[in-house]
Curated annotation (Swiss-Prot):
Organism: Aedes aegypti (Yellowfever mosquito)
Recorded family membership: Belongs to the eIF-3 subunit C family.
HAMAP family on file: eIF3c
Protein name: Eukaryotic translation initiation factor 3 subunit C
Record field: compositional bias (Acidic residues): 162-181, 207-232
Length: 910
């Protein structure tokens, strides 16, 4: 063994001494233990370092999981983070005085933003796996609960998120110091092991000058020499395997200082060279945008600026519009600079109008996705530019901005100035962007209120465009801009209309109804397309119904025949039709026309999807019922929140109207087997309540209406009105009406009347006669009203009775069968049907395979039996004839019984 090691040492000496030959490293260092392992001191870390390192590692894992959207692993890491933070709380309390370290707050803020972003991306959530989707919901709930303790810290962090983390700086300094210590502590023998690291450093710094290269390579040669010297310095195996060899401390310290100085000099030279490169004009090129060389340049310093030059430059800038690599933001800046140049050189209002119109178009083009709203900063700039453009057009009568003007015929220097463009299209796009901004905001937040304030500005812009279009005299464009004005006016309630009806205001006062009438009449007369006229009629009906002009709204509906042709219209027009019919039903209910209100609302409520039909939201459906594209299109059709109609109010009006119609009808046709349902929805609600074994006190609006219906069936109007009109129902429904007290009084009056009719229908077989004053006292109605109701019932043949005026009584005639008789007749009919069905089944089982001549023989045998009374037919035919005869006998017997009962009732009545 000793000879083997000695031989290895001599080989290394000989190979290291030869410079010309390149030979592999000797095998001797494989058996030497690096002094780095033995010489490194054991570092005792504090509790703070341990806890902070654990937190940092978990945060690093969370950031990695965020990149790949691994929600399951992120949930696990978040739970580990909470546990690690709990362990670190004593350290934070002691060292940081209870202040949470900034790197933890930064991680929580980043995680909160990430969770909110993923949660709001509904399309992306649908693409998540089932496990990730479930983990996302759990993570969101736990995170929202956990960060309540960090609200103040998060708020401070979001005020200055770019500030550096103190703990991270300390850790970086510590890591640098530790790395320097490792470099200094390592002995010369370890340099052979770290040879590759030094080569890598040379590769990074090979771009420096030759002197740097020579210095680095000198260092490498020194290290090689030192390593070879170390390998030869051990004269025996014992010295080689000693834990620590003797070394010269003075030389080691000098080597450390020299190495540190060389590293510092190389870093300074590298920074200096990079700064020189930046000064020479290098720039970072973004692959998604065109470079500055590709962008159009402004005018030269001494160039002569005139109209043609500016227009040519404008065309050059706008030529890049719509191209893939065009920087839209830079394009808007170019146009604004061009406008400033035009204003400086006084090139005229026509050039300024042309440039402003192109700026408006460029702002519209900034957002490439049509379905998404534009940013708020662009929205505010858009409003400013359009207002300035319209103000410029109205101030100059000589400027004509029209899409019918060709580019070759544009005129900027002499009046009349002609510019190609369409201000109406820009305003229509502005209105659509305003609607998208409203739909994007949370309707219950202050942002929605702030955006809604912009409607005043948008309405004023439309009003100014109306003046400009009216000045041009184009009927088609006038109809279009009138319809935009109607869309902002038709759903708004004007209290001056009702004050004018009550003559509280002079007759010359102009109200929104007068303005709507003027605008709609113009569209009726001048529009050449059915769509604008249809939308104008529907908006007109909506506005009339909103202000209780029931008869005008009803006449417009009947004369326009929209209910027959609306199915061929586009979806937005159909949505407007549904909104109009809903508002018309509310108007009919306020006027006491319960039947008309029910007819207007039945089509909406029967489907069970009034929310979708009114474009006020999407109802969750199964996966295959609605695709992502359909859902996206339907979301674009949704109405802004401030234009919504209260769905609970609609449903309550529909159910109350159905109750007032259905309950008396059910009492009048209690034993009618062919009774039809007036309202299927109300009938289902009533039946589902009756099927319940235990019914508690009503809580929801539907339960109140069902409880009121049950009370009305017994003629208890007081309990019925209590269920319909109470504090809870007032807050939910009735207080939403204008003049709510009048609506409540009307409703109680109808409940009394329909309860009286139901009472007479239900208990008419109990009374022989009943006093009119008694009924008036029971239902708290005037005698004249009770007399009128009973007279109508007698005339319509709903109640078989007669009025005795001298005694003020109602004499009831029992022309209808009693309850027992009616049930007996129903039982006999059902038994007869059962016998017929059984015999039919028996014939099908036995068959008629042995009949002579098929159907012809069967008919001939039956005819012979009837004419000659011969019993020569088969048993099947005989049973058929016997059944027919028995059925005829039963019918005759029932007819005789009815006649006999009718005669007996008439005799008793006389």
């Amino acid at each position: 063994m000793s000879r083997f090691f000695a031989g290895g040492g001599s080989d290394s000496d000989s190979e290291s001494s030869s410079d010309s030959e390149v030979v592999a490293r000797p095998a001797a260092p494989q058996f030497t233990f690096s002094d780095e392992e033995e010489d490194v001191k054991r570092v005792v870390r504090s509790t703070k370092e341990k806890r902070y390192e654990d937190l940092s590692n978990i945060i690093k894992n969370i950031r990695n999981y965020k990149k790949i959207k691994d929600m399951s692993s992120m949930l696990t890491s978040f739970e580990e983070l909470t546990r690690a933070h709990t362990k670190a709380l004593p350290v934070i309390t002691k060292v940081e005085n209870g202040v949470t370290p900034r790197f933890i707050i930064r991680a929580l803020a980043e995680l909160e933003d990430f969770i909110n972003m993923v949660w709001e991306d509904k399309e992306g959530r649908k693409n998540l796996s089932k496990n990730n989707s479930k983990s996302l919901g759990t993570l969101r709930q736990k995170f929202r609960k956990y960060i309540k303790d960090f609200d103040s810290d998060l708020k401070k962090f979001r005020e200055s998120p770019d500030a550096a983390d103190d703990d991270e700086e300390e850790e970086e300094k510590k890591e640098e110091s530790e790395s320097e210590d490792e470099q200094h502590v390592a002995p010369a023998a370890a340099k052979a092991v770290s040879f590759k690291k030094e080569v890598k450093q040379v590769k990074v710094e090979k771009d420096d000058d030759e002197s740097d290269d020579s210095i680095d390579w000198d260092m490498d040669s020194d290290s090689d020499e030192s390593s070879s010297d170390e390998e030869t310095q051990y004269t025996s195996i014992r010295e080689r395997f000693l834990k620590k060899a003797e070394k010269d401390d003075g030389e080691d310290a000098e080597n450390k200082k020299e190495k540190k100085k060389l590293q510092k000099d190389s870093k300074d030279r590298l920074k200096k060279k990079r700064a020189e490169d930046d000064d020479e004009g290098w720039e970072v090129v973004n692959g998604n945008r065109s470079t500055s060389a590709e962008q159009p340049k402004m005018f030269a310093k001494d160039a002569e600026i005139d109209v043609n030059v500016v227009i040519n430059k404008l065309n050059e800038v706008m030529a890049a519009r719509g191209k893939k690599r065009t920087d839209r933001k830079l394009q808007i800046e170019f146009l604004r600079e061009l406008r400033t140049i035009a204003d400086t050189h006084n090139l005229g209002d026509a050039v300024a109008a042309k440039i402003r119109f192109n700026i408006v178009s460029a702002i519209f083009d900034y957002n490439p996705k049509v379905s998404e709203p534009m940013k708020l900063e662009h929205w505010s700039k858009l409003l400013e530019e359009i207002q300035a453009l319209i103000k410029l057009l109205l101030a100059n009568d000589d400027i004509v901005l029209s899409e019918t003007i060709l580019e070759e015929n544009e005129e900027y220097e002499t009046a009349p100035y002609k510019i190609r463009g369409c201000i109406l299209t820009a305003v229509e796009r502005l209105d659509d962007e305003f609607t998208k901004l409203l739909k994007e905001c949370d309707p219950h937040s202050n942002d929605y209120v702030d955006r809604l304030k912009d409607e005043v500005t948008v309405s004023s812009v439309i009003e100014q465009v109306v003046k400009y279009i009216e000045r041009l005299g184009n009927d088609t464009e006038t109809c279009r801009v009138y319809l935009r004005k109607i869309d902002h006016l038709y759903y708004k309630f004007d209290p001056n209309v009702l004050k004018k009806k009550k003559k509280e205001l002079p007759a010359s006062t102009l109200t929104s109804v007068d303005e709507m009438d003027r605008l709609c009449r113009f569209v009726y007369a001048k529009d050449q397309t059915d769509r604008l006229r249809t939308r104008a009629i529907l908006s007109h009906i909506f506005h009339h119904a909103l202000h209780d002009n029931w008869f005008q709204a009803r006449d417009l509906v009947l004369m326009s025949h929209l209910q027959e042709t609306i199915h061929h219209s586009d979806p937005p027009t159909q949505i407007l039709y549904n909104r109009t019919m809903a508002n018309l039903g509310l108007c009919a209910f306020r006027h006491g026309n319960v039947k008309d209100a029910h007819q207007c609302l039945v089509d909406l409520m029967m489907t069970g999807k009034p929310k979708e039909l009114l474009a006020q939201g999407l109802v969750p459906q199964r996966q295959n019922e609605r695709s992502l594209e359909q859902e996206k299109v339907e979301k674009q059709r949704q109405m802004p929140f401030h234009m919504h109609i209260n769905l609970e109010l609609l449903e309550c009006v529909y159910l109350v109207s159905a109750m007032l119609l259905e309950i008396p009808y059910m009492a009048a046709h209690e034993f009618d087997a062919r009774r039809r349902m007036i309202s299927k929805t109300f009938y289902q609600q009533l039946r589902s309540s009756e099927r319940q074994s235990l019914v508690g006190p009503p809580e929801s609006m539907r339960e109140h209406v069902v409880a009121a219906a049950k009370a009305m069936r017994h003629g208890n109007w007081n309990a019925c009105s209590t269920f319909i009109v109470n504090k809870k129902m007032n807050v939910k429904v009735w207080d939403l009406f204008y003049e709510a007290d009048r609506v409540r009084e009307m409703l109680i009056k109808f409940i009394k009347e329909e309860s009286l009719r139901t009472y007479l229908f239900t208990y008419s077989n109990v009374y022989a006669s009943i006093s009119v004053p008694y009924l008036a006292e029971m239902f708290e109605l005037p005698k004249s009203k009770v007399h009128s109701l009973i007279s109508k019932m007698i005339i319509n043949e709903e109640l078989m009775a007669s009025l005795d005026d001298p005694t003020e009584t109602v004499v009831l005639h029992r022309s209808e069968p009693s309850r027992l008789q009616a049930l007996s007749m129903q039982l006999s009919d059902k038994v007869t049907n059962l016998v017929d069905s059984n015999e039919r089944i028996f014939e099908m089982k036995q068959g008629n395979f042995f009949q002579r001549g098929g159907n012809q023989g069967y008919n001939r045998d039956r005819q012979n039996y009837r004419n000659q009374n011969q019993n020569q037919n088969w048993s099947g035919n005989r049973r058929q004839d016997n059944r027919e005869n028995r059925g005829n006998r039963n019918q005759n017997r029932d007819r005789d019984h009815r006649k006999q009962h009718r005669v007996e009732f008439e005799e008793k009545a006389e």
